[in-house]
């Protein structure tokens, strides 16, 4: 005679405690996976392509704006390296609200620390120097004088490339020289290499191919 096994009632799972719920949520959504790291300023990246048939301003194009570390790297990794640009092209990174031109209200009384590279340095140094320049800007690397920084420009030219950090007030000796010293150190330039700071006004009115330096480090 067949025997019938008695039905067994499944044991219910014990209720989840609040602590276990919290642990479970942390596993699913670790804040590090989705929280972006904000920068102190919002920045705008511009691109200039020298088309002789257009005006200077028509050749200048805003690529993108960003205000987090993650968005900076996403943009940087998406665009062409400076060393791959055609001669006559520029990248400019400026604080949002400042246009990369001398005439801008924040730039017109300012100037630039200028790094001049020879043609051989396009392959060896240009991209490294430009990235370090960008990191100096977005990382506010100039201590109390980071507010004096407006932006930076890389000019890709057949005769030799240039990188410059622009500041807002050329008469502010303390800020300008501090920025220059920190910048030179961050680029790893040896002491024997001298870099110069030129006011935009002097550059605009220069007679000849060179502009006098207001400061050197």
Swiss-Prot record:
Residue positions, PTM Phosphoserine: 209
Gene Ontology MF terms: DNA-binding transcription factor binding; enzyme binding; eukaryotic initiation factor 4G binding; mRNA cap binding; RNA 7-methylguanosine cap binding; RNA binding; RNA cap binding; translation initiation factor activity
Post-translational modification: Phosphorylation increases the ability of the protein to bind to mRNA caps and to form the eIF4F complex. Phosphorylation also enhances its mRNA transport function. Phosphorylation at Ser-209 is not essential for protein synthesis.
Keywords: Acetylation, Autism, Autism spectrum disorder, Chromosomal rearrangement, Cytoplasm, Host-virus interaction, Initiation factor, mRNA transport, Nucleus, Phosphoprotein, Protein biosynthesis, RNA-binding, Translation regulation, Transport
Chain spans, region Disordered: 1-30
PROSITE patterns in UniProt: IF4E (PS00813)
Domain of life: Eukaryota
Compartments (UniProt record): Cytoplasm, P-body; Cytoplasm; Cytoplasm, Stress granule; Nucleus
Site annotation (Microbial infection) Interaction with potato virus Y VPg: residues: 159
GO cellular component assignments: chromatoid body; cytoplasm; cytoplasmic ribonucleoprotein granule; cytoplasmic stress granule; cytosol; eukaryotic translation initiation factor 4F complex; extracellular exosome; glutamatergic synapse
Linked pathology: Autism 19: A complex multifactorial, pervasive developmental disorder characterized by impairments in reciprocal social interaction and communication, restricted and stereotyped patterns of interests and activities, and the presence of developmental abnormalities by 3 years of age. Most individuals with autism also manifest moderate intellectual disability.
Full protein name: Eukaryotic translation initiation factor 4E
Lineage start: Eukaryota, Metazoa, Chordata, Craniata, Vertebrata
Name of the coding gene: EIF4E
């Amino acid at each position: 005679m067949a025997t019938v096994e008695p039905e067994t009632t499944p044991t219910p799972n014990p209720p989840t405690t609040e602590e276990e719920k919290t642990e479970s949520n942390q596993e699913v959504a670790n804040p590090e996976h989705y929280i972006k790291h904000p920068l102190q300023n919002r920045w705008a990246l511009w691109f200039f392509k020298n088309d002789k048939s257009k005006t200077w301003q028509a050749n200048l194009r805003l690529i993108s704006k960003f205000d987090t570390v993650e968005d900076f790297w996403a943009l940087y990794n998406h665009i062409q390296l400076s060393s791959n640009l055609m001669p006559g092209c520029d990248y400019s990174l400026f604080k949002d609200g400042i246009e990369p031109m001398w005439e801008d209200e924040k730039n017109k009384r300012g100037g630039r620390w200028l790094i001049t590279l020879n043609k051989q340095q396009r392959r060896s140094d240009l991209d490294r120097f430009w990235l370090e320049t960008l990191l100096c800007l977005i990382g506010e690397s100039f201590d109390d004088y980071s507010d004096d920084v407006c932006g930076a420009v890389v000019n890709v030219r057949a005769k030799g490339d240039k990188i410059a950090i622009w500041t807002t007030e050329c008469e502010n000796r303390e800020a300008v020289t501090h920025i220059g010293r920190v910048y030179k150190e961050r680029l790893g330039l040896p002491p024997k290499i001298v870099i110069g700071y030129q006011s935009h006004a002097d550059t605009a009115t220069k007679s000849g191919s060179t502009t006098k330096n207001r400061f050197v480090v």
